[in-house]
Each structure stands twice: as C-alpha cells, then as structure tokens.
Amino acid sequence: QPYYEVNGSIEEAPKSSIASELIAHVSAITVKDRVCDNIKTVVEDRLGLKLEGILPTPIIEASISLSDTQKDLGSVFVDLGGTTTSVVIYLGGVFRRLRVLPFGGKNVTLDLTDLQLSEEDADAVKLHYAGATTNADREKTFVIRDIDGISERSIRVLDVNRYAAARMKEIIANVVATVNHSGVLNRIEGGYVWTGGGIALARTEELLRSEVRNFSTYTQLLQYVDKD
C-alpha cells in the first residue's frame, strides 16, 4: 500500500496530478517462502482457484477495524495475539507502517512456569488468577496440585501478577517504541485500538491507560467473538 507526497501533500493516487516534486513511500513486507507456498498449494492446487494475491492479515484487520476518521487523524491498531503482537500505523488516511513483534500472551504463560508450573498449569493460572497490574488481590493465595500430581502447594496471586504485569509492560513498551521509531508518536490523534486474545488478561485496560496516557487521546479495546 504505497502512498505519495505531491508537492509536500499526502496523496494515495497521484495519477494525473501536476507536480514539481513527487515522493513515493513504499513498504517492503517479507515472509517465509514456505508460508506463501502453502497458501498457493491450498488455494490453487487443492481448491482449483486462481490466487490474485496474498495480503498481510494485520493490515486487513486494521483496515476494517479503523474508521476513515481514525485513519485520517492518525491511529495505531495493535493485535496482541498469542505468540506475536502486530502494530499497524495509519496517518493522513494512508497506511504508514507494519511491524510484527515476536511475543504475545503466550509469553506470560511461559514466564509463569518459573513458579515451578507446567506450561499447561501455567496457562490455567494465567486465565484464572493473573492480571496486568499488581494492585489487586495482593494478599490472596490459591492452592494448586504440585508437579508430582499428589501433593498440593499454595501460590500467592501477587507473585503471579508480578510476572504477568512485567511481561505486559514490556509488550506495551515495545509497541510505544515502534510508534516512536516511525516518527509519528506525537501525531496519533485518533488513538490506539487494541484487540487480540492478549488483552483478555484482567486489568489490561487499566495498564494501557496508565502506560499510554502521554501519547494517546483515545484507547479502545476490541474483542471479536466467533459466533460459529
């Protein structure tokens, strides 16, 4: 999705324009060959359809989730998924940047295994007890079956929240750094739109409002439900 500067003004399609200066901004998006090959195999070889092109999922999600006004004012669409976090930036009505960060909600689960939990138990603990801040249930404990499957032990919710909050802060900080590196940090007047399974963690909205208060005028949480 290239965009252009025509005599200093942003244009999506400069065709037929008269200008003394034309600058094209083009994003190069890379992906492993294996991913494209698998898509082509399924669509063309197995389904017998013609593949017109392959579009990056984060950009498509952002294009349908953000309103035209948000895109024009400057907005950041963040999909905090299980293993990755996608950041898509729009400004002046056009796509500006995409970055996929190599961590997400699963990293919270992996961090919780440091409490001598299996990954399966850590995920269950995350879903039932973890929060994105440490200011709740500080004195609360819960009992879980030990690794031997026989004995039991108690774990403080505060310890769980410390791991979860630290990781969530790191993810948010990397999103901020991505926007800052793009050079439009102070121009995001349309705010941030957050979605993905990672934001289902308790008190995530509280953490977001705390961490992004200096550079966002609006924070929105989107949760999509598959009705099927």
Per-region residue spans from a language model:
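Gly/Thr-rich phosphate-binding beta-strand-loop-beta motif of the actin/hexokinase/Hsp70
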Residues: 66-97, 112
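Residue-level signature of catalytic and energy-coupling elements of molecular machines
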Residues: 43-44, 79, 112, 175, ...
